[in-house]
Amino acid sequence: MNELQEKRIYILDTNILINFSVWIPISLNKTFWDGLEEALKDDKWVLLDVVVDEIRYNPELEKWCGKQKRNGLVKKIEDHNRERAVEINNTYKMIDESNGNSTADTYIISYAEENKLSIFSRESFRIKENGLFKIPEVCQRLNIVTIKRPVKFLESISFKN
C-alpha cells in the first residue's frame, strides 16, 4: 500500500454498514465491531448522521450506531452540505423522486468533496443511460476517490482482527 492510500479517509455508505452487519453480525463478532469503533474514534473513517438515519429494521446495527452518536463520533451534515447536495442532484440526477431513495448519497458526496475524503460504497455504475446516477459515477466526474472492496478499507484503517 502506498503512502497516499494509507492516509486516505473514507466515508462509509449505508450499504457498507448493513452488509458488514449481515456478514459479520455484531453479536457474533465483537472484535470486528470494536475495531471499527476504535478506528472511528481515531478519525480513520467517517460516519455521517444521514447514514445512521438510513439504518432501519436492523436493531443491532441501530444500537451500535446509536452508541457512536452518543459518543460524539457521528459527523453532522450542515446546511452548506445540503445546498451542495441539491446542486449535485440537479446536475447528476441521483434521488428517486417517487420515494426519496438515495437522498443520503448526495450528502455523502457533498461532504466528501468539501473535506477531501474518499467514499467506500458497494454501488456500481448505473445500468441504463437514462437511469439515476450512482455514487461511483458522480464521484468519478467530481474527482472523488471511491472503493468497493472491503479489504482496501480495512487496510486503510490498519484493521487487525
Regions found by a protein language model. Name each.
Residues 38-42, 67-73, 140-147:
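Structural alpha-beta junctions
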Residues 77-137:
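Active-site neighborhoods of divalent-metal-dependent phosphate/nucleic-acid chemistry enzymes
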